[in-house]
Amino acid sequence: MSEQTLRSEMLLGSDALARLRRSRVAVLGLGGVGSWCAEALARAGVGALTLVDEDTVSESNINRQCCALHSTIGLPKAEVMAARVRDINPGIAVDARTERYEAATRERFFDTEYDYIADCIDLVACKVDLICTAHARGIPIVSALGTGNKADASRFELCDISRTSGCPFARVMRRELRSAGITHHAVVFSPEPAMTPEALCAPPPGRRSVPGSLPWVPASAGLLMAQKIVLDLCAAQEAQI
C-alpha cells in the first residue's frame, strides 16, 4: 500500500486503486478546467495521462490555471503540466502533446487507446469532432461546457447534455451534436446566468470578446470532471466522498 494514495484507498478500496493505476486518461485543453482535472487525476492515482494543448502559459492565465506561474510564463502548457504531474506521481506515464486537437490531427491523437477522455476544449468544431469520434469508438468521455463569466462554483453539476439550459455554449453544443446524431452526452454544466464582464483587454484574433474568470469556477468544473472519471474507472460511483 502506497502512503501517497492511502487516503483514497480508504474510501475506494485496493482493487479500485489498482484499476486506476492500469488506466490511461486523455485530457484535452489544459486551461482553467483541464489543468485542474489533470492534477486531480494524477493525485488520484491514474497510471497514464495524455495531455494535449497547443498553447503556452501567459500571465493572464495565473488567476485560474494550476500550470500558470510566473516561472512558467511562455512555456508550453502540456509540458508544464507533464512536469507537474510527474512531480506529484513519479511513477505516472505521461504523453505531452503541444498541438491542437482537430479533424486534421484526429488519427494522430487516436493512435493510443484511452480508457477515458476529458474534453476541456473551447473551440466548438474541435469539441464536436472529439465527442463524435469518442462515441463512435466507444470511449467514455465527459465534456466541460461554459465556465467563463460565472461566479458561483456551487451551481456546477454533472448531467446529460439534454438536461442543460440557460448556457449559450451548451445550446450550441446541443445543436451541433444533434446534427451529428448524438442526443445524449455527459457534461459538466452550470445554469448560472453569465455576468457581463468589463472590457479591459482586446480579444485575440477570431474571438469577439474575452470572458472574465474567477479562480474557483473553472477549477470546480475540472474537479467534477475528475470525480466522474475516477469513480467511473473504479466502478465506485456510490463511494462516500
Please provide the spans of the model-predicted regions.
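Conserved N-terminal Rossmann-fold NAD(P)-binding element of oxidoreductases
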Residues: 27-29, 52
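Glycine-rich phosphate-binding loop and adjoining beta1-alpha1-beta2 segment
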Residues: 46-89
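N-terminal charged helix/coil linker that caps or initiates catalytic domains
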Residues: 1-26
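Glycine-rich phosphate/adenylate-binding loop
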Residues: 110-113, 124-126, 136, 141, ...
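Conserved SAM/SAH-binding loop
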Residues: 97-106
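Conserved S-adenosyl-L-methionine
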Residues: 43-48, 136
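Hydrophobic/small residue at the entry helix of a nucleotide-binding pocket
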Residues: 33
